[in-house]
Amino acid sequence: MLSQLIERSTQYVREASLEEQNRIMPLIDFGPYVNQEPGAHERIIQQLRAACESTGFFQIVNSPISPDVVKNAFRASKQFFELPFDEKLTLSKDMFSNRGYELMEDFVLEGEEDSSSPLEISGIDFEAGSYPGEAPLPPSSIGYVLPPSSLANGEGSSMFDADMTTSNAVAHGDESISNEFRESFYFGNDNLSKDRLLRPFQGPNKWPSTAGSSFRKALVKYHDQMLAFANHVMSLLAESLELSPDAFDEFCSDPTTSIRLLRYPSSPNRLGVQEHTDADALTLMSQDNVKGLEILDPVSNCFLSVSPAPGALIANLGDIMAILTNNRYKSSMHRVCNNSGSDRYTIPFFLQGNIDYVVAPLPGLGPSTAEPIAVEDLLRDHFQNSYTSHTTSLEVA
């Protein structure tokens, strides 16, 4: 019974056929466009429009991102995950800035955690950017039980629901079983102003002291190249909507960004990431050659396991883009399951936009069916849901 709780549903997942993969995640060759070949610009616009109106997923080959920059970023990623566990824990994710190390792991028994692990969350004040009391924010050791008393006593903000007793976990008697199995390291723009450093979902970054300067330089260069390319893709997306190329410029000014180094240990029938949509406008993901991505197909209504082209960037649109385009462009459900027998490494870049930008359909795309929402509020809601929506509680006799 217990093992069934952590297995992915195989009833609604299968391998995508070549035709299905081309439909739900088409390949777009940027080479002719980068080389300014005749007709390439118009062709890219048409291909982007078709992909974004379908699932919002597409593959990019021959992008202007330097292969050496990507290679060095993956080298840094593997270097980080090979650090001693205790050292990684010293960089545990700060839940206000969304920076640092996060672990989603197997279950542990309540009451048997190491006494040095700070498990209780007494509240987080998002508005003030501070934490109640003097205790440090706990590491994101998902699978550890968060005592109900620490969440229901009214202290701090209401970021977490009062009845939430586990985070991304399945409660079974005195056990807590993680629904997800991965470890990750979050970082973002390394050159933010003092004012930006005080805002949610932004720096300062947490760099490991023993990794050396080359580690930081490799990841900063990766971030900067991905940001520049993401901004260019946004201008192409604006054109694909028959808008001015600068239609997204205000949204993209001084943007909130996030990058995650991700390692998914091989775990048959165990999800590395639960089904979800991204909160951002645009995600660009580099990956190794180990497959694991599953996309919800709107035609068959089942998850299809896809096999991205070697060296391709996986691009997908998030919830912010769906709102900006009045749902003309899609933010699709997806998840990860690595049953390859090898670790899977990916490095997604998230373009979340200016933290103060009010998200609503762009002019010319029709009236909004929902209330406009600031990027900061949308990200906060998404962040909260990520700690509650995948929690399963069981009544045990």
Curated annotation (Swiss-Prot):
GO cellular component terms attached to this protein's record: cytosol; nucleus
Domain Fe2OG dioxygenase: 255-353
Origin: domain of life: Eukaryota
Residues spanning the membrane: none
Record GO biological process: small molecule biosynthetic process
InterPro entries, A to Z: DIOX_N, IPNS-like_FE2OG_OXY, IPNS-like_sf, Iron_ascorbate_oxido_reductase, Oxoglu/Fe-dep_dioxygenase_dom
GO molecular function: 2-oxoglutarate-dependent dioxygenase activity; L-ascorbic acid binding
Record's keyword terms, sorted: Iron, Oxidoreductase, Vitamin C
Family classification: Belongs to the iron/ascorbate-dependent oxidoreductase family.
Name of the protein in question: Sexual differentiation process protein isp7
